[in-house]
């Protein structure tokens, strides 16, 4: 696992965006050979999306031949609702870059047959071969996507019941009213994430410090979903300084030295 220890959320977003752009450009995608990118929602990736938009506008990257798969979506929330993840992605990213609408894949939380929707999502990912890079965030309790604590590390896309803590955390997007936050969501599984060629998790803020410690210094444990990254051949965690407060000083020092060339000029 790589740990990229930075100072601020803006630096985390900038590093992540730069890494994505470098991966896309090195891949040289075409219509017949697109780059497949997994994407998250939430507050943490917003800085990355801002930097990706800026880099696109500066002519440094095109998303014309990029296919995206989002991590999750609420169940029962209308697509046009401002807090649906369909709305979030268009508002914060898709509407500002040159991605083709037919290349955007989002789970349908209003599907008549939820199981079929989840199965078809997995099948579509497989049809592209694999996701080349999956970017994600992490919850205070270590969940990735909506793979809450005790999720199977072999799980695939499915419906999940959201914990009360997750709903409280997400209530800030619903006017602070936890009762407005859906109780269920569709989410890619831990196994789906681990199938990606590369997984990059963004971790910012002191509230995520315990999750980061579990990911880097703890054991692989289904109660801390983020710890599954230890099983991945190409796992990257990009974090800001407050998120490292539970890590040993020597751990941070080690990774800072290892990644010195990759974190300069930010």
Curated annotation (Swiss-Prot):
InterPro entries cross-referenced by the UniProt entry: Glc/Gal-6P_isomerase, Glucosamine6P_isomerase, Glucosamine6P_isomerase_CS, NagB/RpiA_transferase-like
Active site (catalytic residues): 72, 141, 143, 148
Biological processes per GO annotation: carbohydrate metabolic process; glucosamine catabolic process; N-acetylglucosamine catabolic process; N-acetylneuraminate catabolic process
SUPFAM superfamilies: NagB/RpiA/CoA transferase-like
A molecular function GO annotation: glucosamine-6-phosphate deaminase activity
A single GO cellular-component term on record: cytoplasm
Catalytic activity, reaction form: alpha-D-glucosamine 6-phosphate + H2O = beta-D-fructose 6-phosphate + NH4(+)
Family annotation (Gene3D superfamilies): 3.40.50.1360
Role according to the record: Catalyzes the reversible isomerization-deamination of glucosamine 6-phosphate (GlcN6P) to form fructose 6-phosphate (Fru6P) and ammonium ion.
Annotated protein name in UniProt: Glucosamine-6-phosphate deaminase
Source organism per UniProt: Erwinia tasmaniensis (strain DSM 17950 / CFBP 7177 / CIP 109463 / NCPPB 4357 / Et1/99)
């Amino acid at each position: 696992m790589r740990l990229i220890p930075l100072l601020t959320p803006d630096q985390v977003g900038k590093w992540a965006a730069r890494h994505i752009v470098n991966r896309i450009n090195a891949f040289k995608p075409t219509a017949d050979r697109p780059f497949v990118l997994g994407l998250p929602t939430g507050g943490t990736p917003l800085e990355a999306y801002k930097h990706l938009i800026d880099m696109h506008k500066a002519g440094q990257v095109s998303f014309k031949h990029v296919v995206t798969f989002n991590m999750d979506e609420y169940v029962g929330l209308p697509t046009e609702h401002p807090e649906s993840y369909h709305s979030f992605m268009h508002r914060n990213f898709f509407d500002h870059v040159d991605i083709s609408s037919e290349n955007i894949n989002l789970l349908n939380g209003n599907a008549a047959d939820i199981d079929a929707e989840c199965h078809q999502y997995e099948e579509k990912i497989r049809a592209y071969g694999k996701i080349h890079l999956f970017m994600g965030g992490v919850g205070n309790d270590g969940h990735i996507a909506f793979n809450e604590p005790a999720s199977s590390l072999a799980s695939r896309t499915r419906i999940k019941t959201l914990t009360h803590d997750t709903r409280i955390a997400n209530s800030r997007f619903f006017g602070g009213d936890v009762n407005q936050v859906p109780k269920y969501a569709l989410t890619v599984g831990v196994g789906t994430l681990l199938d990606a060629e590369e997984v990059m998790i963004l971790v910012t803020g002191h509230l995520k410090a315990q999750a980061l410690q579990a990911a880097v210094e703890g054991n692989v444990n289904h109660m801390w979903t983020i710890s599954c990254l230890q099983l991945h051949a190409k796992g990257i965690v990009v974090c800001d300084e407050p998120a490292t407060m539970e890590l040993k000083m020597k751990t941070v020092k080690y990774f800072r030295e290892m990644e010195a060339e990759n974190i300069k000029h930010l």
